[in-house]
Amino acid sequence: MSLMDNWKTDMESYDEGGLVANPNFEVLATFRYDPGFARQSASKKEIFETPDPRLGLRDEDIRQQIINEDYSSYLRVREVNSGGDLLENIQHPDAWKHDCKTIVCQRVEDMLQVIYERFFLLDEQYQRIRIALSYFKIDFSTSLNDLLKLLVENLINCKEGNSEYHEKIQKMINERQCYKMRVLVSKTGDIRIEAIPMPMEPILKLTTDYDSVSTYFIKTMLNGFLIDSTINWDVVVSSEPLNASAFTSFKTTSRDHYARARVRMQTAINNLRGSEPTSSVSQCEILFSNKSGLLMEGSITNVAVIQKDPNGSKKYVTPRLATGCLCGTMRHYLLRLGLIEEGDIDIGSLTVGNEVLLFNGVMGCIKGTVKTKY
């Protein structure tokens, strides 16, 4: 039985399990827009640099799958060689000083290409949107190029064809502000886009003006792999399993099951910190199992645990999609590069003090440490 078939057998029980708080849910994608992923060369203003191709931000196979409307291939990450060599290089980010590819930016089309490179894993985001819409039987005719245009128009607050369009595009490619992008598609196929400015201070603390574009990407999006990473979230392991369904496998606005868990996480973290139970908390996550006791995911992240291979080397293992975890784009990307691998993880094997890797398409990868079970 395929993963899609497994989801279909669960459809009748969604309402009974209280998973669909809002029957008018929207399919959701959230991802990062970051000018640091395609930025102006220090020596030539018409040249924009993007990360080294070895970092795999663009994949021609994925682009071809989109052209062929083969969206289900997203669920089958092609086999790759071990990412051990790449991981070793990533752990020395300053070694990527001159490794990049370039875009000569002279026309509006070139500027749009620069902006496209700044949307993190946009191709994979589009694939995941399409497969989710197909599952929920939602008609959708927006192409990847159309989606890019809508994203740009939202960021510059100007429609293509407007007399100010060219000027605003030019201004946009020179700005440094990062955004959390939200693409929402209704059950009638209507699309809306939100751009939420991200706090820049935490991002700028991770990098320097002298970093290459590849080094910037590694320090901001692959930070959890770095030996000297200073970011480490507090992690709660939930004692209550999550009911795996299409509403855990796909990202939608029906998220009450996650919201309830984050309230329990808030209480657990405040107990640890000696704070009032309802005090706001940040930089923390709660991890769930499914009803079979297998680790699934976090409330806002996918997760990988650290294990040892037969040679004693560290490896990162993430739950299989069959557990019901979100088919996240960052998860897909890390699997594609061989930086993580899939496996079954008994949630009972997680103990206080264990280090984990947390990741999503907005914050990238960060370290976390299990602090308590609750």
Curated annotation (Swiss-Prot):
GO terms for cellular component: cytoplasm. GO terms for biological process: carboxylic acid metabolic process; folic acid biosynthetic process; tetrahydrofolate biosynthetic process. The keyword Disulfide bond does not apply. Pathway: Cofactor biosynthesis; tetrahydrofolate biosynthesis; 4-aminobenzoate from chorismate: step 2/2. Pfam families: Aminotran_4. Its cofactor is pyridoxal 5'-phosphate. It catalyses: 4-amino-4-deoxychorismate = 4-aminobenzoate + pyruvate + H(+). Keywords: Cytoplasm, Folate biosynthesis, Lyase, Pyridoxal phosphate. The keyword Transport does not apply. It is found in: Cytoplasm. Homodimer. Present with 768 molecules/cell in log phase SD medium. This is Aminodeoxychorismate lyase. The gene is ABZ2.
